[in-house]
Structure formats: structure tokens, C-alpha cells
Amino acid sequence: MNKSQVISAWSNGRSGRTANGSLTSSTDGTLRSYNLVIGIHTANGFIVGDFTSSGTYYSNTTSTHVGNASQVAPIVSVDDFKVAQTELAWL
């Protein structure tokens, strides 16, 4: 799959993976750039953490993945993203 197809799979609750495995989606609602969770499905919809140079930088590739995912989900601060992840863990 290409990146756009993986993002589409994620936003539709399906699993997907790029050929090199750098971007993966899971049926548990997570989107990963390498091993870093960059997107989740919350009760209010999908969100993406701002792991970019304007937020909490991780890598160039991850920044690109965040940008791709922002086409289907809003970007939130990494702090807000971590709070949402914690809330999901309690469900």
C-alpha cells in the first residue's frame, strides 16, 4: 500500500501497511510511524499528534506521515494527544 492508502485504511478502521513498513494502521484505531503512535481513534473521532517541527519533532519521515494523516484528521498538540491516549487506556 502507499501512504494515502494506509491513511484511508486507518480512517476506515482497517489495517494497512506501506511496503517498507514505515507507516501502519491497525484495527485498534492506531496509526504508527515506525513504532511511534501518531494517530488514534477516540470517542470523538480520529486525531493526529503534532510530531512535527512545529510541535514535538520526531523525524522527517514522521513529520511527513503526520502531514499525510492531517488530510483526514485534525492535528492536536502532543500533550493533548497523550491525554487522549491515556483516556483510551481506561476504556
Where are these regions (language model features)?
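Terminal leader/tail segments of proteins
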Residues: 1-91
